[in-house]
Every structure is written in structure tokens, then in C-alpha cells.
């Protein structure tokens, strides 16, 4: 029994020494295009897309573990039409910004380098709306709101050179929680889908 335990401990130490002996970048800087399919949980707005992009910063502490900062911005400039039973009620347009931080796990070797992340932070939105009553008469307004943001997901990087990687896909579940002061009775929570594609720059290989 003791010999098996010693063997297991030795094998674990060998794996950890092998992992730490691998060369990996100390810093990553991803930038790219992104869109979010927003689900505001409203009867008149089931979902809509906002488009934008941004970047981030990753500091890798080990060959597989790093801490990531992620900053993204989105807009819906053309506006979302509001209808009920075929009747036009108005339109809504606005922006969304997210600022999140958290751990990233990534394989830093081979032709394909998958990664996963879990990020937490804040979101900011501003909204412009024109609302019309069914019996006639319209009103316009605007507002902004700050809330909690969280996302977790997976992605893939493909090395092109030692310092440039192509990121064809990153998909995330993005949760946001705002107050319901924009629309009376609105849900404070939104469950959204996020997609990112772009380039990842790596620096400081160990």
C-alpha cells in the first residue's frame, strides 16, 4: 500500500514538473469582434442582437492558469421595433458595456489551444426609447443603468506565429442583472449569448 502511494505521489510530482517545464506566454492580449444576443425577458422584446468588440489582458501564473481582464462594448444603433399583436408601439436603441475579471484555464501547446474562463464584474447600459400607446400618442425618453455581469464559456486559439494567434471562436453564457427602472415591471435579470472572434497576441514566453 505504501509503495503504491509513493508511486502515485511520484507520478503526480513528475506531471507537475513536466507542466511547469513547458514554455508558455506570461501575457496575452486578445482583441476582436463580438456580438451578444440579448434576452431582456419582455413580451414585446423577446431577443435582439447588439454588435461591437473590445479586448482583454491575461497574466498567466502557470502553464494552464491565468487571470483575465475583459472589456467589451456593444451598440444597437438602428433600434429594435416594439410590436404587440401586429401593432407598432415604438422602438428602443442603446449601448452595453461590460467590465469583467476572473480565471482562465488554457492549453498553451499544440496547433489547437482550447481555453475556458469564468469572469465576474459590472455592466453599464444606456437606453433611448420612443413608446406609443395603442390609442394614440407617443413619448420618448432615455436612461442609464449599472448592474452585475458574469460570464463563462469556451474558446479556441490557433497559433499563426510565436506571438500571434487566430481566435475563430469564443462562445459564452453572459448573465446581466440590472434594476428594472427602465421599464416598469421588467425583469432585473437577462440571460444572453455572446460570440467573439479575433486575434490573440502573446508575449514573454517562459
Give residue spans per PLM region.
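Cleavable N-terminal export/targeting peptides
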Residues: 1-24, 204-206
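Sequence/structural signature of outer-membrane beta-barrel proteins
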Residues: 34-42, 75-83, 122-129, 174-183
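Gram-negative (and chloroplast) outer-membrane scaffold detector with strong preference
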Residues: 28, 56-137, 147-148, 158-160, ...
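Subset of outer-membrane beta-barrel
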Residues: 47-49, 157-166, 171-181, 186-192
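Surface-exposed strand-loop-strand hairpins of Gram-negative outer-membrane beta-barrel proteins
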Residues: 35-54, 145-146
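Extracellular loop and loop/strand-boundary signature of outer-membrane beta-barrel proteins
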Residues: 39-43, 83-91, 134-142, 180-187
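Short sequence motifs at beta-strands and strand-loop junctions characteristic
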Residues: 23, 47-50, 93-97, 142-149, ...
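Transmembrane beta-strand segments of Gram-negative outer membrane beta-barrel proteins
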Residues: 23-37
Amino acid at each position: 500500500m505504501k509503495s503504491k502511494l509513493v508511486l502515485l505521489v511520484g507520478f503526480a510530482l513528475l506531471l507537475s514538473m513536466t507542466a511547469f517545464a513547458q514554455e508558455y506566454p506570461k501575457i496575452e492580449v486578445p482583441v476582436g469582434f463580438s456580438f451578444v444576443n440579448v434576452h431582456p425577458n419582455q413580451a414585446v422584446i423577446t431577443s435582439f442582437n447588439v454588435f461591437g468588440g473590445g479586448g482583454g489582458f491575461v497574466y498567466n501564473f502557470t502553464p494552464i492558469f491565468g487571470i483575465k481582464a475583459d472589456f467589451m462594448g456593444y451598440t444597437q444603433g438602428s433600434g429594435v421595433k416594439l410590436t404587440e399583436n401586429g401593432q407598432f408601439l415604438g422602438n428602443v436603441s442603446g449601448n452595453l458595456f461590460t467590465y469583467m475579471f476572473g480565471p482562465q484555464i488554457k492549453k498553451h501547446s499544440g496547433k489547437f489551444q482550447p481555453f475556458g474562463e469564468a469572469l465576474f464584474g459590472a455592466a453599464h447600459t444606456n437606453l433611448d426609447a420612443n413608446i406609443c400607446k395603442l390609442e394614440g400618442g407617443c413619448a420618448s425618453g432615455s436612461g442609464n443603468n449599472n448592474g452585475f455581469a458574469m460570464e463563462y464559456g469556451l474558446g479556441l486559439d490557433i497559433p499563426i506565429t510565436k506571438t500571434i494567434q487566430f481566435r475563430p471562436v469564443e462562445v459564452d453564457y453572459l448573465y446581466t442583472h440590472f434594476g428594472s427602472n427602465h421599464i416598469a415591471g421588467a425583469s432585473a435579470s437577462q440571460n444572453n449569448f455572446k460570440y467573439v472572434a479575433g486575434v490573440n497576441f502573446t508575449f514573454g514566453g517562459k
